[in-house]
Amino acid sequence: MESNKIFGQELWGTLYTIAKDVKIQIEFNPNKVKEYRLIGYENRMLNNEDFNDDKKDAGEIGSGHTVTAIYEVVLSDGSESSGKVDPLNYQISSVVKSNDIMTLKIRYKKPNQDFSRLITEKVTEGDLKKSENTKNFMLAVSVAEFGMLLRDSEYKGSASFDHVLLWAKRAKGEDTYGYIAELITLVEKSKLLAKL
């Protein structure tokens, strides 16, 4: 099974790059989002000014591969302030009225080009609600929670192996290559080891 995974499904993704120097930038609407935290990627953070710098290297995406960024978000009713950020001295900090939760920007270069292209997408509460019940979302949440448990993250909160299993089993559906079944087995074994 492992050789089929490596040579059958993953080889072409490593041999054939479809995008290089891929960068993702998120801007949350402060009227809708009180606080947020990126889960994972601590070692891959870019400075804000590096997003538009075509000379700054970033990740590559191979054929058939995807990238997932997960944020923990505390929604706001728009009237409160977390009080954690000082006001700006040299910039206007007024908030634009909008129903968007965030703006997603993706910058990438085609493999044979040296200039980047920009994709900008607004995300609404409705968009988020639609994605909450997808199998991909459930799988991503279970993997992120599992990772926080394995490294005993200070942010794990009430995360548990049982919760990871619940979400992973909901995500299973058609598991053509057995990856989700393998995840479930790993979580079950980790749960047993954690009791020792």
Language-model features, listed with the residues they occupy:
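Hydrophobic/aromatic-rich, well-ordered segments within soluble, folded domains that form packed cores
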Residues: 62-73, 178-190
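Conserved functional hotspot residues or short segments at active or partner-binding sites
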Residues: 79-187, 193-195
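Acidic, polar loop-rich interaction surfaces within structured domains
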Residues: 1-100
